Design a protein with these regions (language model features):
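Extracellular adhesion/glycan-binding regions together with long Ser/Thr-
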Residues: 2-4, 65-77, 127-168, 172-173
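Intrinsic-disorder/low-complexity loop/linker signature
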Residues: 48, 59, 73, 93-94, ...
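Generic preference for hydrophobic/aromatic residues in regular secondary structure cores
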Residues: 50-55, 87-89, 118-120, 171-173
Length: 201
């Protein structure tokens, strides 16, 4: 009788273990066998825009410059007369980037905005922005398409599509020939920035 009970206990134990194994395997299969093929293609869109320059600062610093004509200003070369910079963008996917090249006044300027002219050309020296007094330049507004801060002077706007882009620019700045400079030392600093923002899809 004891032998019979022992056999039943062993049989029940084996059966219990077998049921437990089947249950665990079944639950594991149910938990990990579900899969679904996506029906929507995943796309990653990205874009970057940068500005590079070799000068110590990102702009021009005029100090005690004399007023000159536009013809003379357009022919300026050398340090503190010109600022060479490069705008580069790498755009992938279906992104389009709106960008703007802006300028802001530096600290300690003593020449009025109406007394200074700027002139922007490309790498071939082709005119992009005609000689213009700083106070006549358009200013950025809040929420602009390129994501630039408000109240910066606009030198150039544009759009980049898919691909790699590199544009070289030269900014010239001089004291306008109709500006009457006082006898004291005069200074004007203009710093250049570039901003870019992907177009919302």
């Amino acid at each position: 009788m004891n032998n019979n009970n022992s056999s039943k206990q062993v049989l029940v134990s084996i059966l219990g273990v077998a049921i437990l194994i089947v249950a665990v395997v079944g639950i594991s299969f149910a938990a990990f066998s579900y899969s679904k093929t996506g029906t929507v293609a995943n796309t990653i869109t990205t874009g970057t825009i940068t500005m590079s320059y070799s000068e110590p600062i990102n702009g021009i610093n005029l100090t005690d410059a004399l007023p000159i004509t536009d013809t003379a200003g357009k022919a300026l070369t050398g340090a503190n007369n010109t600022f060479d910079f490069t705008v580069s963008a790498t755009v992938s996917g279906s992104t389009t980037i709106n960008y703007v090249v802006t300028a802001v006044k530096g600290d300690g300027c003593t020449v009025a905005d109406g007394g200074v002219k700027v002139y922007l050309t490309d790498q071939e020296d082709a005119q992009i922005l005609a000689p213009t007094k700083v106070n006549a330049l358009t200013k950025t507004v809040a929420g602009n398409a390129a994501g630039a801060p408000a109240d910066q002077y606009v030198l150039k706007t544009g759009t980049y599509g898919t691909g790699a882009h590199t544009d070289n620019y030269r900014l010239r700045m001089w004291v306008a020939d109709d500006y009457t400079a006082p006898a004291t030392s005069q200074k004007y600093i203009l710093k250049v920035n570039v901003y870019g923002q992907a177009v919302a899809k």
